Amino acid sequence: HFRKRSKLSKSAREAIEERAKDYFARFMEIEDITNNTIFFDTRIQASTVDEAEQAAYKLRDMWNMGEDPVVNLLQLMENKGIKIFIYNTANEAFDGFSAVYSKIAMVVIASWLEGNLPRMRMTLAHELAHLVLDLPEDLSEKEHEDCANVFASAFLMPEAPFSEMFGGKRDRILIRNLFPIKSYFGVSLPAIVMRAHRLHLIGNNLKQRFFIYYNKMGYKKDEPGDYC
């Protein structure tokens, strides 16, 4: 699933798809020889962002994850039968896409994300959403993306532990108070703020003020706070 509004050119997209197909074809030959294929075929119906959030919790239940943080999402997805290819590129117009070829669920992510683990984890969770969510065909591209974004955030930051760490409803945010949340869930500061807004812990004004400050401080290129 490539995002239709991606800034990636058609030729660049096709090159990535071809490279990925070659990689997965070779990968599957090796698995055929070793008779080691695990098929990932989990689908959960949803038609709204609220149902997408519930689908994330349902998948956590199916995988016996409780509400604990996801320590290694890439390894978890591979253990469940999703094939992952890290495509070597510095082109930040591409972050990832997912597809199913010959019943094999596949995710391709950009190698530049390895320098930004919180972003990499959110991209993986977003592509997991596209593989898992069984959405109505008449939903718009934006609605598909909104559902995938909410699923990804809920999967990485379940409501109960997140709300407790965030401290309930807030009318101000201190950046340093978000660092423990970033470290615990392995997500970026903007992802935390968007999740807090989604859960009605902060309002529109506070969300907007945060992003103005975040951009002004240049945190998009060099975000403070450790991710462990």
Which ranges hold each PLM region?
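Active-site hotspot residues in diverse enzymes, especially metal/ion-binding acidic/histidine motifs
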Residues: 1-228
